Amino acid sequence: MAGIPDHIKALAELSPVEDLLLAVLREGLPGIRVKSLIDQHETFPLVLVRRDPSFGEWAGDTRFTDAARVAVHTFAPDPNGDEDAAVLGEAVRVVLRDAWLKNRGVPGRGHITRVDLNSPPRRASDWATATGPVQYADLPTGVWRYEAVYDVYIRKPRARPYPLPH
């Protein structure tokens, strides 16, 4: 048996928040690669979306909503990579805000009901932000990264993301 059985998948009421945000950002940023994982030989510009571990109390309601702290990384190459990554970070903010104000939904993934900017886009010098003695590899020469953190609130989809096949 490969993967998990359909009847187990059908129990899920929420899909990964990244799946909803990938769909929203890909639609709102045509021509820009938007992903949740980095390829070994990545090309730029790039927007990377990742759910952060939550600290404190989770703000969702398992009957109706999900809540997530999400890190959004924007990468851009020279020339003008520093400015381009900053501008791309601002474009992401606008797309997410507009998705919230329009109650944007993605079938099987949910609806964005609120987006709060927790930490605005800021320049970072390596692949990921280190918060302890662990340090991450430097970015490729000529590539710039900005990181922002959002708190995203999601109403679960009307239909479960993985319904049983009929």
Label each residue range with its predicted role.
Residues 1-32, 53-166:
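Charged, amphipathic alpha-helical segments and their flanking helix caps
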